[in-house]
Amino acid sequence: MKRTYQPNKKRRVKKHGFLNRMSTSDGREVIRRRRQKGRHSLTVSDQ
C-alpha cells in the first residue's frame, strides 16, 4: 500500500505557498493569524 504523503516541492508550494494564501480572503486570514501568533514562517514558501 502506498503511503498518503508523497512529497513534491511544486505541489507543496502551489497548494500552500504565499501567493496561493493571498489569493483568497480565507488565505489572507491564515496569514494574519500566523503573523499575530508570531510564527517564524508564515507559509511553506518562506524558507
From Swiss-Prot:
Origin superkingdom: Bacteria
Bias regions of kind Basic residues — which residues?
31-40
Please verify whether the record's keywords include Magnesium.
no
Give the coiled coil ranges: none
Which residue intervals make up region (Disordered)? 20-47
Keyword Ribosomal protein listed: yes
Which keywords annotate this record?
Answer: Ribonucleoprotein, Ribosomal protein
Question: What does UniProt give as GO cellular component?
Answer: ribonucleoprotein complex; ribosome
GO molecular function term, any single one: structural constituent of ribosome
Q: Which PROSITE patterns match?
A: RIBOSOMAL_L34 (PS00784)
**Which Gene3D superfamilies would you find in this protein's record?**
1.10.287.3980
Pfam families assigned: Ribosomal_L34
Which InterPro entries has this protein been placed in?
A: Ribosomal_bL34, Ribosomal_bL34_CS
Q: Which GO terms describe its biological process?
A: translation
Record-stated family: Belongs to the bacterial ribosomal protein bL34 family.
Protein name (database record): Large ribosomal subunit protein bL34
Organism equals Malacoplasma penetrans (strain HF-2)
Its gene name is rpmH
